[in-house]
Amino acid sequence: VHLTGEEKSAVTTLWGKVNVEEVGGEALGRLLVVYPWTQRFFESFGDLSSPDAVMNNPKVKAHGKKVLGAFSDGLAHLDNLKGTFAQLSELHCDKLHVDPENFRLLGNVLVCVLAHHFGKEFTPQVQAAYQKVVAGVANALAHKYH
């Protein structure tokens, strides 16, 4: 992902304020609610029968935290996202058979959740930088599929 110095600064400054557990759980939960077909990958998580059940499910929250932990690793290696996410790409492609489009959807949901959490601090410039990052991460996660 090519970011200007200003964009990198905007991304890392905001990310330093992110509660990974809270935002991760909310982002994954919203993905599962808005795109219910994605729930098929999480059948072992128990009750996903309603939006409230999804958003309050401890396994959804825990996995969301794990997902954003990996995203944090990506932010530390923006010039090598494919290498950073190679093992996760292989896992999601070969073992889990996740449609790579879901990575793009989750990235867009994450941007919405960040905007909701940070309000005016999530300026159009910050949003544009995050769109570049989530697109780069989604592309790296989809790499094994190509």
From Swiss-Prot:
CDD domains in UniProt: Hb-beta-like
Tissue expression summary: Red blood cells.
Keyword Endoplasmic reticulum included in the entry's annotation: no
Signal peptide start-end: none
Domain Globin: 2-146
Gene3D superfamilies attached to this UniProt entry: Globins
Listed GO CC annotations: blood microparticle; haptoglobin-hemoglobin complex; hemoglobin complex
Binding site for heme b: H63, H92
N-acetylvaline: modified positions: V1
GO biological process: hydrogen peroxide catabolic process
Positions carrying Phosphothreonine: T12
Pfam families: Globin (PF00042)
Sorted UniProt keywords: Acetylation, Heme, Iron, Metal-binding, Oxygen transport, Phosphoprotein, S-nitrosylation, Transport
Annotated coiled-coil segments of the chain: none
InterPro entries: Globin, Globin-like_sf, Globin/Proto, Hemoglobin_b, Hemoglobin_oxygen_transport
Residues bearing the modification S-nitrosocysteine: C93
GO molecular function: haptoglobin binding; heme binding; hemoglobin alpha binding; metal ion binding; organic acid binding; oxygen binding; oxygen carrier activity; peroxidase activity
Similarity annotation: Belongs to the globin family.
PANTHER family recorded: HEMOGLOBIN FAMILY MEMBER, HEMOGLOBIN SUBUNIT BETA
Protein name in the entry: Hemoglobin subunit beta
Source organism of this protein record: Leontocebus nigricollis
